[in-house]
């Protein structure tokens, strides 16, 4: 049929943990079947006195690491913990077969930090208003 618009009644769901797990698993199966894309996800954390004081997440797929959510507690910033954390995530990714790393950061976050650790900008766009997002990568 042509000329007809389908307007399904979508449902907004919050919280969405169960629903996301359902369709994300199906999407994962689709990608795995189509191109052998399997995602490995891990977190690196540092605890002091039982509390998490630094952490970051790695997603590995298609031979690449995506660094997500790198965070260091404010009193520990500038002490080398962030560099060690990023290095630990990259080392784990290499151990799992990744040969490239990618991430994004915002203008108020850690662009100079990532540049010091070999990341190169490959895209930049204005977002959100008054700021910008930088997409970066590097070879591992």
Give the residues covered by each predicted segment:
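Conserved catalytic-core motifs of GNAT/GCN5-like acyltransferases
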Residues: 102-104, 120-137
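Conserved beta-strand in the GNAT
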Residues: 51-59, 64-71
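Conserved beta-hairpin
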Residues: 41-54
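Conserved acetyl-CoA-binding loop-helix of GNAT-fold acetyltransferases
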Residues: 78-91, 116
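Conserved active-site tyrosine of GNAT-family acetyltransferases
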Residues: 23, 114, 119
